[in-house]
UniProtKB/Swiss-Prot annotation:
GO terms for molecular function: ribosome binding; translation regulator activity. PANTHER family: RECEPTOR FOR ACTIVATED PROTEIN KINASE C RACK1. Belongs to the WD repeat G protein beta family. Ribosomal protein RACK1 subfamily. This is Small ribosomal subunit protein RACK1. It comes from the Eukaryota. Keywords: Repeat, Ribonucleoprotein, Ribosomal protein, WD repeat. The keyword Repeat applies. InterPro entries: G-protein_beta_WD-40_rep (IPR020472), RACK1-like (IPR045223), WD40/YVTN_repeat-like_dom_sf (IPR015943), WD40_repeat_CS (IPR019775), WD40_repeat_dom_sf (IPR036322), WD40_rpt (IPR001680).
C-alpha cells in the first residue's frame, strides 16, 4: 500500500484567482484565503463530500486584488497585502479591519508575521521590503539604493529559527536575499535563477530555503551557509512553494500541476492534476464542453498543521483540498 494524495473536496466562494491560503498552527477548522476578487474569505471546514468548507465571512476593504494573507499564531488575526498598496490587519471574530499599514508606493505582493507576531514584514512592486510593528508603524525600509533588490520584491518570509532571526526575500531581479532581522542587514544573496523568482519557502526547522519562479527550477539553499544545495526540475513556471510540516516533502504549484518531491530521494512522489470533467459531473452531474476546454492551474498552496491535508487555490477561484490516503 503506497501513501499518496487524493482529492477530498472543493471550496467555492471566490469569483477570481485564489492568491493565498493561510492555515492555523493549532490545526483548528478555520482557514483563510485571499483572492483577486478583492476579498478575504474565512472558512469553516466541514469536510463534507460536496463542499469541504463553508464560507463564514467575507472580509472586504481592499480596493484592488488581495495578493497575500497570513494568520497570527493564535488564529485571531489575519494580515493581508493588496495591489492597493496597503496591508490590513483583520480581527477575525469581529470580521473587521482594525489597522491599515500605509507606506508602500506600489502593489504589496507579500506579507508575513514573525513567530511571536510582534513584527510584520511586507514586500512590494516599489522594490522595497518594509518591517512594521503591529500598530502599523513602519520601523525600517530596505530599499533598492543600498543592499536591496533591483526589481519588484515578490515574496518575503520569516525563518522560524529563533536563534538567528532571519527574513528571506525573493525578487524579479532573479535573486533571493537573506536578511538579519536584528539590524535589517544583508546576510547573503542567493543567485542561481535565470528568470524572475516569484516564491520562497523556509523549511519548518529554518535550515532550508526553497525558491522558484519563471525558469521552472526549484533551488534549495542552506540558509545558515547561504549556499545552493541542489535543484529540482519542475519544467513549468512555479507560482507557489511549501514544505510539508511532518514529512521531508516540498510542494510546488506549477502551471502544469502540483508537484511534490521527497527531498531525501529528490524524486517526484506526486503530480496532482485537476480533472474538471469529473469535478463537474460530481457537482451537478454534467460535464460540459466548456469545462473540458478551460485551462486552470494552481496559484497558492498550504498544508494543514498536522500535514494531513493540502489546500490548493486555483485560477478559477476554487480551493481544492487533497488528503493523504493509502491506495
Amino acid at each position: 500500500m503506497a501513501e499518496g494524495l487524493v482529492l477530498k473536496g472543493t471550496m467555492r466562494a471566490h469569483t477570481d484567482m485564489v492568491t493565498a491560503i493561510a492555515t492555523p498552527i493549532d490545526n483548528s477548522d478555520t482557514i483563510v484565503s485571499a483572492s483577486r476578487d478583492k476579498s478575504i474569505i474565512v472558512w469553516k471546514l466541514t469536510k463534507d463530500d460536496k463542499s469541504y468548507g463553508v464560507r463564514q465571512r467575507r472580509l472586504t476593504g481592499h480596493s484592488h486584488f488581495v495578493e497575500d494573507v497570513v494568520l497570527s499564531s493564535d488564529g485571531q488575526f489575519a494580515l493581508s497585502g493588496s495591489w492597493d498598496g496597503e496591508l490590513r490587519l483583520w480581527d477575525l471574530a469581529a470580521g473587521v479591519s482594525t489597522r491599515r499599514f500605509v507606506g508602500h508606493t506600489k502593489d504589496v505582493l507579500s506579507v508575513a508575521f514573525s513567530l511571536d507576531n510582534r513584527q510584520i514584514v511586507s514586500a512590494s512592486r516599489d522594490r522595497t521590503i518594509k518591517l512594521w510593528n503591529t500598530l502599523g508603524e513602519c520601523k525600517y525600509t530596505i530599499s533598492e539604493g543600498g543592499e536591496g533588490h533591483r526589481d519588484w520584491v515578490s515574496c518575503v518570509r520569516f525563518s522560524p529559527n529563533t536563534l538567528q532571526p532571519t527574513i528571506v526575500s525573493a525578487s524579479c531581479d532573479k535573486t533571493v536575499k537573506v536578511w538579519n532581522l536584528s539590524n535589517c542587514k544583508l546576510r547573503s544573496t542567493l543567485a542561481g535563477h535565470t528568470g524572475y523568482v516569484s516564491t520562497v519557502a523556509v523549511s519548518p526547522d529554518g535550515s532550508l530555503c526553497a525558491s522558484g519562479g519563471k525558469d521552472g527550477v526549484v533551488l534549495l539553499w542552506d540558509l545558515a551557509e547561504g549556499k545552493k544545495l541542489y535543484s529540482l526540475e519542475a519544467n513549468s513556471v512555479i507560482h507557489a512553494l511549501c514544505f510539508t510540516p511532518n514529512r521531508y516533502w516540498l510542494c510546488a504549484a506549477t502551471e502544469q500541476g502540483i508537484k511534490i518531491w521527497d527531498l531525501e530521494s529528490k524524486t517526484v512522489v506526486e503530480d496532482l492534476k485537476v480533472d474538471l470533467k469529473a469535478e463537474a459531473e460530481k457537482s451537478d452531474g454534467s460535464g460540459t464542453a466548456a469545462t473540458k476546454r478551460k485551462v486552470i492551474y494552481c496559484t497558492s498552496l498550504n498544508w494543514s498543521a498536522d500535514g494531513s491535508t493540502l489546500f490548493s487555490g486555483y485560477t478559477d477561484g476554487v480551493i481544492r483540498v487533497w488528503g493523504i490516503g493509502r491506495y
